[in-house]
């Protein structure tokens, strides 16, 4: 930093973390101080998983609860297989499942096409919680439900999960 009295002091350059876009039915993992982002979370859910010990972070954008009735296809599209794929990719990058924590957002009741009155958003939320529990990953923050869309950002170096929606201020989980 330049000081105008003739002296100079050095300060470390502050760099903006890399922005990694996670599309619908995709997941990404990083060990770098990046910002993982996804948008368009209506009934979809963004699941951020962070390893608090090894600084490995991942984000998946799931659309539907279960791949049980689907043969093949994109695993990241479904809560059960998308979360499993994300956890496996994080473990491959050096994460420990014992140190993982999850934060989740989305699951809005945007549309109701079900016969039993249960919306896709609420079924997604239920399956996300069940799947994380099966893998021993606690949910430490969530912003679910409502009737509005969301966008999220995961700060990979801190685990902060920033949720933005049209009708509220940003919140950090």
UniProtKB/Swiss-Prot annotation:
Q: Give the UniProt family note.
A: Belongs to the CheD family.
Under Gene3D superfamilies, the record lists:
3.30.1330.200
Which regions form coiled coils? none
- State its Enzyme Commission number(s): 3.5.1.44
Q: Which InterPro entries does this chain map to?
A: CheD-like_sf, Chemorcpt_Glu_NH3ase_CheD, Cytotoxic_necrot_fac-like_cat
GO terms for biological process?
chemotaxis
Question: Which Pfam family would be a valid example here?
Answer: CheD
> What is the annotated signal peptide range for this record?
none
Any idea what job this protein has? Probably deamidates glutamine residues to glutamate on methyl-accepting chemotaxis receptors (MCPs), playing an important role in chemotaxis.
Tell me the HAMAP family matching this sequence: CheD
Q: What is this protein's record name?
A: Probable chemoreceptor glutamine deamidase CheD
User: Which reaction does this chain catalyze?
Assistant: L-glutaminyl-[protein] + H2O = L-glutamyl-[protein] + NH4(+)
Organism, as annotated: Haloarcula marismortui (strain ATCC 43049 / DSM 3752 / JCM 8966 / VKM B-1809)
Gene Ontology molecular function, alphabetical: protein-glutamine glutaminase activity
Alphabetic keyword roster: Chemotaxis, Hydrolase
